[in-house]
């Protein structure tokens, strides 16, 4: 007997990939319900070659649903996820809304699937840039410990949604085909739809993802810091991030510097990463082999390379980490959580509702 699975935000960049990942999943599924806003309700999508009409998301959409995958923005999750839990579903939320809620486990299945065991009806999927870094760092943390993490990201525009993809393609065409000066291209979305100014991304790099906080870091950077500490259950671990948007469509890349508690031999570090589930070692500088964003598109794995000792700090290590931000960074991690819920016997209704109905 299979599950009824709902996908909220089914027509978006992540939602469409959730459908694809669910089609390829080992999760036993009897029925899929596709939900969206009024703008997309009525569209017809396919699941395993069957037409499925997209329905409007309402408070009553979750009757009979076992698992609900949310990727329609934090406000949608805040409004509807508690109703899904009340109806008996387990929610896997791909937005930031519940990530720091102490009643909600924040899960990368390869790293901390056990955190789901006492769930209260909602499991949060971490930020895309956090997820791939966790896959790369966990095998090192397990063997040698971590005393510091510093990361600089090179993030694809798809992390800002389909509208950002469309804007980037338009801008590049205007520069290449029409000869428009890159500085003169009109922008409406990036670096953050919620901020006062917008800048072109074509032939540019924007050192801002999301809006700035009071401490001069962006919310994206603080997500990486706070989520890393929560997932690793190390609240005192020093973590800092600089997040940059670059003009590629898919796959995030990260330059990660860590300091380990115990000195870690580089060849042993490479072996630990190569053996870790979900990680692929691509590190052969003699043959110029290292992770590339273009090569990661469409893959579920996280690719790690350029692993090398710091020149001055004995326990310092640098690496390059790449993954498809819409798959492992979002859709696949969400479906993978659903698979883990099934495997661990955790697809169950929650007796006590701990989330506010709005």
Swiss-Prot record:
Residues noted as binding NADP(+) in the record, renumbered to the chain: 11-14, 39-40, 158-159, 325
PROSITE patterns: ASD
UniProt binding sites for phosphate: 99, 223
Enzyme Commission designation: 1.2.1.11
Pfam families according to UniProt: Semialdhyde_dh, Semialdhyde_dhC
Residues annotated to bind substrate: 155, 245
GO MF entry, a single one: NAD binding
Matching Gene3D superfamilies: Dihydrodipicolinate Reductase, domain 2, NAD(P)-binding Rossmann-like Domain
Catalytic activity, reaction form: L-aspartate 4-semialdehyde + phosphate + NADP(+) = 4-phospho-L-aspartate + NADPH + H(+)
Residue positions of the active site: 128 (acyl-thioester intermediate), 252 (proton acceptor)
Keywords: Amino-acid biosynthesis, Diaminopimelate biosynthesis, Lysine biosynthesis, Methionine biosynthesis, NADP, Oxidoreductase, Threonine biosynthesis
Job description of the protein: Catalyzes the NADPH-dependent formation of L-aspartate-semialdehyde (L-ASA) by the reductive dephosphorylation of L-aspartyl-4-phosphate.
Family according to the record: Belongs to the aspartate-semialdehyde dehydrogenase family.
HAMAP family hit by this protein: ASADH
Name used for this protein in its record: Aspartate-semialdehyde dehydrogenase
The organism of origin for this protein: Streptococcus mutans serotype c (strain ATCC 700610 / UA159)
